[in-house]
UniProtKB/Swiss-Prot annotation:
Localization in the cell: Cytoplasm
Domain of life: Archaea
UniProt lineage: Archaea, Methanobacteriati, Methanobacteriota, Stenosarchaea group, Methanomicrobia
Keywords per UniProt: Aminotransferase, Cytoplasm, Glutamine amidotransferase, Repeat, Transferase
Subcellular location, principal: cytoplasm
Residue stretches making up the Glutamine amidotransferase type-2 domain: 2-226
One GO biological process term: fructose 6-phosphate metabolic process
MF (Gene Ontology): carbohydrate derivative binding; glutamine-fructose-6-phosphate transaminase (isomerizing) activity
E.C. code: 2.6.1.16
This protein's name: Glutamine--fructose-6-phosphate aminotransferase [isomerizing]
Length: 618
């Protein structure tokens, strides 16, 4: 959840690091800091936005090697003393480092190091690493003579550490070097000319270089302005593949929109089109998923699909569960990743695990995938980030071709995740002779219409804005849906919570009478997703239930539905579509409703409080 950057080059390090940290702001943070090797270690920190850090840094700060960090508090409250970098070896110190991850045995290590004379100035787990590295190099807190190089001392320290980490470390005695290490937390190296970079995310340095190397678990690296050396866990040099990032940095700019989120809602038209490209054939009535390392015979033999996901991705997975069971006739379970490892899952032969993660770095999802792989279960990852950790660990990978998503609240990655789940379920159904090629041809025709239908919704966003502004000060919202619309109700409520800080709950509409209806007050806004389908009549009954309690009902319904207007206060329209695909349209309305509510409430839409884009700690 934190952002790490490192620089070794020919230019002044501080401006490069500050620029890179700003590119990582979308990950969420509460404080920031940098260290530059100038006349020894020089460290500057600040609470709050990066602009607060900038005013602390001297304009004439020299040094061409440095590290930086945006912190999201996990151990210790947001404060200057808890902000990274953390140093060891006196003031200003011999060692300085930044860390993303969690050290699980830090209390035992802290007690040990305190007994050896090390003084702790923060409440963080990270400071333990700084002192431990210092101890292995200098022997004691006031040690002046190095017994070994920084890389060797780091390797020895890592043998004592339990937990996850991405580390960037500097030593005052090795002024031209930046040393890195990784386990269970993302870290990537950017290769420049006369300069090299390190970061949690390629976005940090993409305007400097497109050539990158991804650091794997248990690898260490040494960067200088002119060289990059990478080593395995035994310390042997490794040759690594250089990958080129193809997408443009301009794709991550706002392009005239007020917020990234609004831009990304609009980009769903292109994102879904790109995700479908090369994967469907109307003429043949077939779906092509060449990245899927499963034969047709293996697909026929599947007895179970296990979906693993968190947050918005879990909502996509819940809809996927309905699709796999309804279309392909395959039993499907879905688990929240943070719970999965602790319930001793019963595994069966013929199970396919599908892990859904926007970033490919979600710590809980990676842990769940590793757990299920211990049962020799084949794994398929659905992610948006090429080269992310999950792409290197799963057996198969399907990419949502959504492009970079900067807004913390997921929009286009959600609809492209759904798109891939539709393709998977229909492909499995076709292979298992549950759907005919003629049906698949018709389905593909309808699916290809979705981007244009989303554009129609975007063209009427003023009506959604007007509705949102009318209820922006409401204290609580209900979102109701049945069957395929239930996951969309959950996602709509989550969007509103995330960016407008309004209490909102999504419910299966049939569950209202089992308790939630007691919460309804006069005028409570209830968003009812009531597109036509097999549960439409029951949904109308639920709407009548809440209207009888004087709730204000906002319906999401198709543009040919005249019946709905008799029972609700406002109708937000979507184009008429196949019942199966209606969720792809309804969610766009709810994304816009959340956006305009947050805008009316003057909230921080792209970087909501207390949230991070990439959740890389468990």
């Amino acid at each position: 959840m934190c952002g790490i950057v490192g620089y070794a080059g020919r230019n002044a390090a501080a401006p490069v690091i500050i620029e890179s940290l700003k590119k990582l702001e979308y990950r969420g943070y509460d404080s920031a800091g940098i260290t530059v090797l100038s006349k020894g270690i020089e460290t500057y920190k600040a609470v709050g936005k990066i602009v607060n850090l900038e005013v602390e840094i001297p304009k004439n700060l020299g040094g061409t090697v440095g590290i930086g960090h945006t912190r999201w508090a996990t151990h210790g409250r947001p404060s200057t003393k808890n902000a990274h970098p953390h140093n060891s070896g006196g003031n200003p110190g011999k060692i300085s480092l930044v860390h993303n991850g969690i050290i699980e045995n830090y209390m035992a290590l802290k007690e040990q190091l305190t007994g050896e004379g090390y003084v702790f100035n923060s409440e963080t787990d990270t400071e333990v690493i700084a002192h431990l590295v210092h101890k292995h190099i200098y022997g004691k807190p006031d040690g002046k003579e190095a017994k070994c190089e920084l890389l060797v001392g780091l390797r020895e320290a890592l043998k004592e550490i339990e937990g996850s980490y991405a580390l960037a470390i500097l030593s005052a005695d090795e002024p031209g070097k930046l040393v890195l290490a990784r386990k269970d937390s993302p870290l990537v190296i950017g290769l420049g000319k006369g300069e090299n970079f390190a970061a949690s995310d390629v976005t940090a340095f993409l305007n400097h270089t497109r050539d990158v190397v991804f650091v794997n678990d248990f690898e260490t690296a040494v960067l200088s302005p002119t060289s990059v050396e990478i080593f395995d866990r035994e310390g042997k040099p490794r040759e690594k593949k250089i990958e080129k990032i193809e997408w443009d940095f301009e794709a991550a700019e706002k392009a005239g929109y007020e917020h990234f989120m609004l831009k990304e809602i609009h980009e769903q038209v292109t994102a879904i089109h790109n995700t479908l490209a090369g994967k469907v054939s109307e003429l043949e009535g077939d779906i092509y998923l060449k990245e899927l390392n499963l034969s047709e015979d293996e697909i026929r033999k599947l007895a179970r699909v296990q979906i693993l996901a968190c947050g918005t991705s879990w909502h996509a997975g819940l809809l996927g569960k309905y699709l796999f069971e309804q279309l392909a006739g395959i039993h499907c379970d879905i688990d929240i990743c943070s719970e999965y490892r602790y319930r001793n899952p019963v595994m069966n032969e013929g199970t396919l695990a599908i892990a859904i993660t926007q970033s490919g770095e979600t710590a809980d999802t990676l842990a769940a995938v590793r757990e299920i792989m211990s049962y020799n279960c084949p794994t398929l990852a659905i992610t948006n980030v090429v080269g992310s950790t999950i792409t290197r660990e799963a057996n198969s990978v399907l990419y949502t071709r959504a492009g970079p998503e900067i807004g913390v609240a997921a929009t286009k990655t959600f609809t492209t995740q759904l798109t891939l789940l539709y393709l998977l379920a229909v492909k499995f159904a076709l292979v298992r002779d549950r759907l005919s090629p003629d049906y698949v041809k018709s389905f593909i025709t309808d699916l290809r219409k979705v981007p244009g239908q989303i554009q129609q919704i975007l063209n009427q966003k003023e009506a959604i804005k007007e509705c949102a502004e009318g209820f922006a000060r409401s204290k609580s919202y209900f979102f109701l849906g049945r069957h395929l619309n239930y996951p969309i109700a959950l996602e709509g409520a989550l969007k509103l919570k995330e960016i407008s800080y309004v209490h909102a709950e999504g419910f299966a509409a049939g569950e209202l009478k089992h308790g939630p209806i007691a919460l309804l007050d006069e005028g409570t806004p209830v968003v009812a997703i009531a597109t036509r389908g097999q549960t439409y009549e029951k949904m109308l009954s639920n709407i009548k239930e809440v209207k009888a309690r004087d709730a204000f009902v906002i319906a999401v319904a198709d543009n040919k539905d005249t019946e709905i207007t008799k029972y609700v206060d406002v109708v937000l329209r979507v184009p008429q579509s196949d019942e199966l695909l209606a969720p792809l349209l309804s969610i766009v309305v709810l994304q816009l409703l959340a956006y305009y509510t947050a805008l009316a409430r003057n909230c921080s839409i792209d970087k909501p409080r207390n949230l991070a884009k990439s959740v890389t700690v468990e």
